[in-house]
């Protein structure tokens, strides 16, 4: 597929472009025909591919775990049940080790975050040309299949966690306690403007770093796969080397995929634990 483009730059730009729907400059609504047109659509434009893949993978997660729960047996687990039980035990251990309070929401939330992010990251292991080529044959000009390479998705996830942190911070400590936590430490109370600035920046940095860490790592991984795919258009020697390189990077990328999902989940638990901690 790389040979169908006029240049390597055009190939890369195509694979990094989302299928974006929004309002055109003339007031009509439709899909963007390039990066500039997508940018001109503004804030309310929707990356349709990111939405469809992220929602679809979320539904897949619910379906698989629901199926495993319905078919669970008291004997030795096998197949899907074995995998689901292992994941749940892993999440339970992680929550017990990082969350020191009582909240029935945290463990299911941690499970959902881990599996959802993992499945979105896992899409990066699909060959970069497969689904975009099928989409092109169906008349769809652009298709990005890895939702976690879209900052809109990663920021949506991190902001959801951030709002939960704010909610539990106020619920557990009260509005006054939460404010005093921001304004009266680490320096003496008369320096509350400095404290408020420092703690406020630290608070806002949490969702930003959470989103950018996931986005940056997955975007870089996708870019490497795209660059390797370019080698298949450079003759059989480069194609052979590219195939070996792609396999090696895919094996290594499995670690990155899992690690990024684990980090996102762990930081979610830690932030919620901090929100539940009593103010002193």
Swiss-Prot record:
One of its GO terms (molecular function) is proton-transporting ATP synthase activity, rotational mechanism. One of its GO terms (biological process) is proton motive force-driven plasma membrane ATP synthesis. GO terms for cellular component: plasma membrane; proton-transporting ATP synthase complex. The chain crosses the membrane at residues 45-65, 105-125, 126-146, 159-179, 190-210, 223-243, 250-270. It is a multi-pass membrane protein. InterPro entries: ATP_syn_F0_a_bact/chloroplast, ATP_synth_F0_asu, ATP_synth_F0_asu_AS, F0_ATP_A_sf. Its main location: membrane. It is found in: Cell inner membrane. Keywords: ATP synthesis, Cell inner membrane, Cell membrane, CF(0), Hydrogen ion transport, Ion transport, Membrane, Transmembrane, Transmembrane helix, Transport. HAMAP family: ATP_synth_a_bact. Key component of the proton channel; it plays a direct role in the translocation of protons across the membrane. Belongs to the ATPase A chain family. F-type ATPases have 2 components, CF(1) - the catalytic core - and CF(0) - the membrane proton channel. CF(1) has five subunits: alpha(3), beta(3), gamma(1), delta(1), epsilon(1). CF(0) has three main subunits: a(1), b(2) and c(9-12). The alpha and beta chains form an alternating ring which encloses part of the gamma chain. CF(1) is attached to CF(0) by a central stalk formed by the gamma and epsilon chains, while a peripheral stalk is formed by the delta and b chains. This is ATP synthase subunit a. It comes from Thiobacillus denitrificans (strain ATCC 25259 / T1).
